[in-house]
UniProtKB/Swiss-Prot annotation:
The gene is glmU. Its cofactor is Mg(2+). In the N-terminal section; belongs to the N-acetylglucosamine-1-phosphate uridyltransferase family. It comes from Actinobacillus pleuropneumoniae serotype 5b (strain L20). It is found in: Cytoplasm. UDP-N-acetyl-alpha-D-glucosamine binds at residues 9-12, 23, 74, 79-80, 101-103, 138, 152, 167, 225, 331, 349, 364, 375. This is Bifunctional protein GlmU. Binds 1 Mg(2+) ion per subunit.
Length: 457
């Protein structure tokens, strides 16, 4: 099988974005557009990915530093053909070269596989699409059904402007052919640029076949030159993802008000209310219910869990039949066992909470281990930070911590202990002990509250 390398054009400035950020770093579904393209190139087993960069190259390299790409500088942006000329020295004669665009993030693996399979032995496979309104796009010129040329909008005559089949810019040919044609490009056109589309005419002159393959959906080859187009790509992507989930059995209360910015795996009878955001890798068990306005990122949720509205869960694990929220926050390292309750305005960070334990109101539990069947009252704080270092709080099983208590770490509270409301616990507590730490209550007879003094005019 012929090896494949991919060239991704990503040197454009993106003037119409009105942004300091390079165009290809603007995001769709929480991920830079160019990252989508790189990921798709990996899916089709590209041997090498050549990334053409220019404007904002330092930031681009910084953001994509972990990607195994060959960085190719295009110092001047003189057209798509000029960009390919910069990468040509890296092409092997006997490999196929696939040309993609860093600002067209929704191209699919399936479409690219169809295109590559259609490439003639000594020719080009070209991806096209038919549009109701083709204004602005290069027109596909055919003779007897075969593609003989691509004419850019600015160079097209009146008859050519009526053509609805347009060029997407995506094509594949052999390394040897590309190197030959790229060496003969010129800029004799209205823009004074080197067009990659000119290689189509060159291929015909050499007697090579140009095979056109139509994309199944225009939006998968659409680029984003401004924020309006970027928003359209985002909506199309989200609509597509929502439809896949609906067909897989997930109930989305309103598919138009659901965003996924990563991957979601799920069990049966999952229900997701409006304005929920999924980020990173999220796993949902069976019969999970997620209330309105929740954000879930890189988390695992067990069967029969209910997440009430406006809760945020990040890098956390929630066990079966737990109840979360409303307005709860589970931060990285939170691990809740089954049948736990975490209520409104509770924050849990880097802490384990045992089976059946309840942390229901206005509480912070950080750097802690909480055993099973505990009750943590309202306003309880694990004081884990002394301004320089963090320390751990360990709470055993069947512990009751009264409201407004402070547990000053490092501290251990053994099984069955009871902490009275308002206690400040600085020393370890033994099994079944009661701790009370409060000022004795005083009663002052005849007390009168101060009254406001009137200010003279």
């Amino acid at each position: 099988m012929t090896q494949l390398s991919v060239v991704i054009l990503a040197a454009g400035k993106g003037t119409r974005m009105y942004s300091d950020l390079p165009k290809v770093l603007h995001t769709v579904a929480g991920k830079p557009m160019v990252q989508h393209v790189i990921d798709t190139a990996k899916q089709i087993d590209a041997k090498q990915i050549h990334l053409i960069y220019g404007h904002g190259g330092e930031l681009l390299q910084q953001r994509l530093s972990s990607e195994p790409v060959n960085w190719v500088l295009q110092a001047e942006q003189l057209g798509t053909g000029h960009a390919m000329q910069q990468a040509a020295p890296f092409f092997a004669d006997d490999e196929n070269i696939l040309m993609l665009y860093g600002d067209a993030p929704l191209i699919t693996k399936e479409t690219l596989e169809r295109l590559i399979a259609a490439k003639p032995a000594n020719g080009i496979a070209l991806l096209t699409v038919e549009l109701e309104n083709p204004t602005g796009y290069g027109r596909i010129i055919r003779e007897n059904g075969s593609v003989v040329a691509i004419v850019e909008q600015k160079d097209a005559n009146a008859e050519q402007l009526k053509i609805r089949e347009v060029n997407t810019g995506v094509m594949v040919a052999s390394g040897a052919s590309f190197k030959k044609w790229l060496a003969n490009l010129n800029n004799n056109n209205a823009q004074g640029e080197y067009y990659i589309t000119d290689v189509i005419a060159m291929a015909n002159q050499d007697g090579y076949k140009v095979q056109a393959v139509q994309a199944s959906e225009f939006m998968e080859v659409e680029g984003a030159n401004n924020r309006l187009q970027l928003a359209a790509l985002e909506r199309f992507y989200q609509k597509t993802q929502a439809e896949k989930l609906l067909l897989a059995g997930v109930r989305l209360i309103d598919p138009a008000r659901f965003d996924i910015r990563g991957s979601l795996t799920h069990g049966k009878d999952v229900e997701i209310d409006v304005n929920v955001i999924i980020e990173g890798e999220v796993k949902l068990g069976n019969r999970v219910r997620i209330g309105a306005g929740c954000v879930l990122k890189n988390c695992e949720i067990g069967d029969d869990v209910e997440i009430k509205p406006y809760s945020v869960i990040e890098d956390a694990v929630v066990g079966k039949a737990a109840q979360i929220g409303p307005f709860s926050r589970l931060r990285p390292g939170a691990n809740l066992a089954e049948e736990t309750h975490v209520g409104n305005f509770v924050e849990i960070k880097n802490a384990q909470v045992g089976k059946g334990s309840k942390v229901n109101h206005l509480t912070y539990v950080g750097d802690a281990e909480v055993g099973s069947n505990c009750n943590i009252g309202a306003g309880v704080i694990t004081c884990n930070y002394d301004g320089a270092n963090k320390f751990k709080t360990i709470i055993g099983n069947n512990v009751f911590v009264g409201s407004d208590s402070q547990l000053v770490a490092p501290v251990t509270i053994a099984d069955g202990a009871t902490i009275g409301a308002g206690a400040t616990v600085t020393k370890d507590v033994a099994e079944n002990e009661l701790v009370i730490s409060r000022v004795p209550q005083r009663h002052i007879q005849g007390w009168q509250r101060p009254t406001k003094k009137k200010i003279a005019d």
